[in-house]
UniProtKB/Swiss-Prot annotation:
Boundaries of every PPM-type phosphatase domain copy: 227-630
Protein name per the record: Protein phosphatase 2C 35
Lineage: superkingdom: Eukaryota
Record's keyword annotation contains Magnesium: yes
Origin organism lineage: Eukaryota, Viridiplantae, Streptophyta, Embryophyta, Tracheophyta
Entry-linked InterPro entries: PP2C, PPM-type-like_dom_sf, PPM-type_phosphatase-like_dom
UniProt subunit comment: Interacts with XA21 (via juxtamembrane and kinase domains).
Keywords for the protein's UniProt record, in alphabetical order: Cell membrane, Hydrolase, Magnesium, Manganese, Membrane, Metal-binding, Plant defense, Protein phosphatase
Family: Belongs to the PP2C family.
Swiss-Prot/TrEMBL cofactor(s): Mg(2+); Mn(2+)
Length: 639
């Protein structure tokens, strides 16, 4: 597993939900405790990569922001949480892949998580009803808190406690009975995330030459050249219902990749994205964001005209698609066949790091507007080629597995390199930046703060960096109707062909080509008029240069915004970190979604989470949230 486990108790007093985080509590000793609700995880940057910061610097830094726009601002910590509402469904191809003893566990796990050593993670565990811990009042709800509150820490977050690598075996005696069961359950829950790629590769060998799918050895070598896990690459990936989350961090190169994939109609498209999109992004960006000693890369993707944030770009469809071969770190022998079946990151390798170029020689090459556009175009190519590979392989299997034509996913991908942040999205997931307004600086410096949320002046503004692609956006509705003038039902029941709320998506072939619609059972077919696609996978793109005004970034699936506006989400994180600097802001947002959903339905927290998966989808969607702090200022952004 690699991730260190810790769990703390949080809850609300009888008077409300404020101050839910209290003293530590042990994990339940019951080895069968549920981890299907979701998970919380974090990554805190090692001290050597962090610029020292004190609370007194906030106002001075903010006032100097305009003069320091070119100053690099890097992330300090990553907080993530995911909550499942949908029932877990097996991969369509699982009958080809799973051994009998694996199929049951894989099909029923609604949540799973796996990571390298520098991430810490725990399952979301609700505080028991009427339990009394270190405080006298009973808890009214909430989760045992996430990994940002570690050990018996009572003060602000100490980064040294979470600087990697984290020991995977250092657990207290109170947790000894729970940890082995937790690891077993997480390993079973993660198996589905690697099934689809392996099945499709095996099934399509008889349809395609090996060149069509690329050389696995060449793909593995490319990953090794990027600085794999033994040389500092850290990763995390997990699932919650139909959502998938993927994080890759390279401290040596100074970049972080985050992917949030909000699937629909099944897990195959999202699992394919987890297995392949990062690999494609890395391949397309080679030579743009880093140099490599062994290969001279020609900059043949330069745009003709400069620009910093085009909305969509077309994909070059000439290059061949490559695939990664799974490799894994050494573990105690369990049999070669069994080892092959374990879920593991695509890029994690056993390799000799001595031939890698030193970090100081891996230079950031994006230094002009043209370079930023080239990076955005490279992200688009990576997405399009990933979808082409998915649809091409699924096309060979659609006769046997017609449901593959229904499956798709929204895509939100963020790449941060130094002070440059690149955002790509398809669908209705969002990236929201919390930034400080200069007009509020004088109020902040003159205001007082006595520890209560109500006395904290609103410091930050919410800036949405993505575009929503759904029928709720009038421009998208007009575009689809203009593209299908002969089809009055192109948009019906506030959905594309009465089926899909989003107007752009990865996969969902039945809305892109008539042949995939015809492959479906009659009850699932739409009335496909003409041959033009109803939806596309053309992303919206954005480049943003971070400044000292920027405090944190919220990346999330649309489940968060069922109960929050952008401004409310930023305000919730801002107030939470002001009152609980050692807390987990992503988990707090997920918790608030449940409280708001329960309140809307006229029930309490525990009544809601006791509703089975699937039925609970009527009250809230799957929710995946990642909060990235910038220069550590998230922890003192409103002092």
């Amino acid at each position: 597993m690699g991730n260190s486990l810790a769990c703390f108790c949080c809850g609300g007093g009888a008077g409300g939900r404020g101050g839910r985080h209290v003293a530590p509590a042990a994990l339940p000793s019951d080895p069968a405790y549920d981890e299907g609700l979701g998970h919380s995880f974090c990554y805190v940057r090692p001290d050597k990569f962090v610029v020292p910061f004190s609370a007194d610097d906030l106002v001075a830094d903010a006032k100097a922001a305009a003069a320091a726009e070119g100053e690099a601002t890097t992330f300090r910590a990553i907080s993530g949480a995911a909550l499942s509402a949908n029932v877990s469904t097996p991969l369509s191809t699982s009958v080809l892949l799973l051994m009998p003893e694996e199929s049951s566990a894989s099909a029923t796990a609604s949540s799973g998580f796996e990571s390298s050593e520098s991430f810490a993670a725990v399952p979301l565990q609700p505080v028991p009803r009427f339990s009394s811990g270190p405080i006298s009042a009973p808890f009214s709800g909430g989760f045992m808190s996430g990994p940002l509150e570690r050990g018996f820490q009572s003060g602000p977050l100490d980064a040294a406690l979470l600087s990697g690598p984290l020991p995977g075996t250092a657990t207290s005696g109170r947790m000894g009975g729970a940890v082995p069961a937790l690891r077993r359950s997480l390993s079973h829950g993660g198996r589905r995330l690697r099934n689809f790629t392996r099945a499709l590769l095996a099934r399509t060998e008889k349809f395609q030459d090996s060149a069509d799918l690329g050389s696995p050895d060449a793909a593995a070598a490319a990953v090794a050249a990027c600085g794999g896990d033994p040389c500092g690459l850290q990763w995390a990936q997990g699932k919650a219902g139909e959502d998938r989350v993927h994080v890759v961090v390279s401290e040596e190169r100074g970049w972080v990749f985050v992917g949030i994939y909000d699937g629909f109609n099944g897990p195959d498209a999202t699992d394919f994205l987890v297995s392949n999109l990062y690999a494609a992004v890395h391949r397309e960006l080679r030579g743009l964001l880093w140099d490599q000693r062994e290969q001279n890369v020609q900059h043949d993707q330069r745009p003709d005209q400069p620009g910093s944030a085009p909305s969509t770009t077309a994909s070059d469809n000439q290059d061949q698609w490559g695939r990664r071969r799974r490799t894994r770190r050494s573990r105690p022998p369990r049999g070669a066949d069994d080892d092959q079946r374990r879920w593991k990151c695509e890029w994690e390798q056993e390799r000799d790091c001595s031939n890698l170029k030193p970090p100081t020689q891996q230079r950031l090459r994006c230094n002009s507007e043209n370079d930023h556009v080239a990076v955005l175009k490279a992200l688009t190519r990576a997405l399009h080629r990933t979808e082409e590979a998915y649809l091409d392989i699924a096309d060979k299997m659609v006769g046997e597995f017609p449901e593959l034509a229904l499956m798709g996913s929204c895509v939100l991908a963020m790449l941060m390199k130094g002070e440059d942040m690149y955002i790509m999205n398809v669908g209705d997931s969002r990236a929201v930046l919390a930034t400080m307004d200069s007009v509020d600086l004088e109020q902040i410096s003159q205001g007082s703060f006595d520890g209560s949320v109500g006395d904290c002046p609103p410091c930050l503004s919410a800036v949405q960096l993505t575009s929503d692609h759904s029928t709720s956006v009038e421009e998208e509705v007009i575009r689809i109707r203009n593209e299908h003038p002969d089809d009055p039902s192109a948009i019906s029941k506030d959905r594309v062909k009465g089926s899909l709320k989003v107007t752009r998506a990865f996969g969902a072939g039945f809305l892109k080509q008539p042949k995939w619609n015809d492959a479906l059972l009659e009850m699932f077919r739409i009335d496909y008029v003409g041959s033009s696609p109803y939806i596309s996978c053309n992303p919206s793109l954005f480049h943003h240069k971070l400044s000292t005004r920027d405090r944190f970034l919220i990346l999330s699936s649309d489940g968060l915004y069922q109960y929050f506006t952008n401004e409310e989400a930023v305000a919730q994180v801002e107030m939470f970190i002001a009152t609980t600097p050692e807390g987990d802001p992503a988990q707090h947002l997920v918790e608030e979604v449940l409280f708001r959903a329960a309140n809307k339905a006229g029930m309490d927290f525990h009544e809601l989470i006791e509703i089975p998966h699937g039925d609970r989808r009527r009250y809230h969607d799957d929710v995946s949230v990642i909060v990235i702090s910038l220069e550590g200022r998230i922890w003192r952004s409103c002092v």
